[in-house]
Each structure stands twice: as structure tokens, then as C-alpha cells.
Amino acid sequence: MLGKYQGGAYWFPGVIESIAKGTVTIRYDDGERETLGKRAVRPYDWMIGMTVECDFKGAGDWYSAKITSLAGEKIGVVYDDGSKEKTKTGRCRSS
């Protein structure tokens, strides 16, 4: 699943832990947990070739990148400047 963490503008990947009375509790791939309304979650739709933003080297700087590989929580991306990185889905987001 993808969830809008804290009602923000970006979608972050995670898994559903529970569903109750119009809410969904999601555990994000970075380990955070949150309970959201059903409108704040959507099916996971990331695929190779899709553009996302990733936290380059985990330093807190987010850059646009294209997905080059996906395997569970592992993701390969190439940034707009040509830099490549293998990272975790928990360090990426989509808009």
C-alpha cells in the first residue's frame, strides 16, 4: 500500500496492519506506523520506469529518480543527474 504520511503531499510505501471502521493502520517501509482514513491510502503501484523521489544516501536530501529495479523493499534508481543508487523503498516517495 501507499499512504499519505501525516496527511502530507507524498505517498510512502508500507503494509496494512489492520482495518477498522473506515480507518487503515499502515506500517511504512521505514518502520513508522500511522492510522489513516481510507482516502489516504491507495494500492502500491510503483514499477520499473516510474518516477519517484528518494532520500539520496539517507542524508535527508530528496531528488527525483527513475526506478530501475524492484525486489521487495529493495529499489534501484537512477537520479536525474545520472547518479545511481540501490536503496530501500522506505527512503523513497511518490507524488
Where are these regions (language model features)?
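Eukaryotic chromatin- and chromosome-associated nuclear factors
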Residues: 1-95
